[in-house]
């Protein structure tokens, strides 16, 4: 795109102020999301790694001498009423339809997720809700992404969808970080993850009470993160649309706004 540049130095400074305000807000939103992700990880670690989830009296379980028992499959002590399961028992795993790169365009509204996260945009989506998608081909095998609602997930990623939809999928996203995903990777030439190899991964299975309680606590963090990402997209689009209009003089800046 050819953009005609403003020659007036004061106008250039005003334009820079406006664009800088967009960049600052976008950076702030990304920082908020980083903090939200860190909080979600910390919560999982505290409850499901250190086992200091709230017991029946609201006290941290393990620190309050909650009974622990050895689990042979997980090779560790876990709370007495907890057990193990496999990824395939609690999740549906599948690879959706792949899109050709020629069909993607930055002008389309819906994000497309592949092996390396967002790979472009498309005019349709194949998943209504936010999903957990794992890269299953190439050097990025095992990398996890939370997709945005109304996104297209390609066959280069494995969708990992909890069968029990009363449980927030942040649980499985965090649990997979502690599973032996690397050991499930196969392929002598190009690394790959198959559904069969992933389905047998051992996962900790907390009590239903704790899973539901965890979901209630973590859901607002996930919702906030998704909303921040939507605002980042909106601000980025506005900035990119506004830039050429400002530079060629089609849009002018109110001097009161430029001084804010």
Q: Can you describe what each PLM-predicted range is?
A:
Residues 42, 46-62:
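Alpha-helical scaffold segments that mediate packing/assembly in large oligomeric complexes
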Residues 4-46, 65-114, 210-254:
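Non-catalytic DNA-recognition/assembly elements of restriction-modification systems
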Residues 1-6, 55-206, 255-260:
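DNA target-recognition domains and sequence-specific DNA-contacting regions of bacterial/archaeal
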């Amino acid at each position: 795109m050819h953009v005609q540049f403003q020659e007036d130095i004061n106008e250039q400074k005003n334009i820079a102020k406006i664009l800088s305000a967009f960049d600052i807000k976008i950076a702030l939103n990304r920082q908020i999301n980083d903090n939200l992700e860190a909080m979600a990880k910390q919560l999982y670690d505290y409850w499901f790694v250190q086992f200091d989830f709230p017991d029946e009296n609201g006290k941290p379980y393990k620190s309050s001498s909650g009974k622990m028992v050895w689990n042979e499959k997980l090779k560790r002590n876990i709370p007495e009423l907890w057990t193990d399961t496999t990824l395939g028992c609690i999740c549906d795993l599948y690879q959706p339809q792949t899109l050709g790169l020629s069909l993607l365009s930055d002008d389309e509204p819906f994000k497309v997720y592949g092996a390396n996260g967002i790979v472009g945009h498309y005019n349709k989506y194949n998943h209504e809700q936010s999903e957990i998608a794992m890269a299953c081909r190439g050097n990025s095998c095992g990398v996890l992404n939370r997709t945005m609602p109304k996104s297209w997930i390609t066959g280069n990623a494995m969708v990992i969808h909890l069968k029990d939809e009363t449980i927030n999928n942040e649980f499985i996203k965090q649990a997979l970080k502690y599973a032996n995903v690397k050991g499930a990777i196969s392929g002598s030439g190009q690394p790959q993850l198959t559904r069969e190899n992933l389905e047998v991964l051992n996962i900790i299975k907390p009590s239903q009470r704790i899973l539901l309680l965890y979901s209630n606590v973590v859901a607002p963090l996930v919702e906030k993160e998704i909303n921040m990402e939507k605002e980042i997209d909106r601000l980025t689009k506005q900035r990119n649309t506004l830039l050429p209009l400002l530079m060629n003089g089609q849009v002018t800046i109110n001097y009161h706004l430029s001084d804010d």
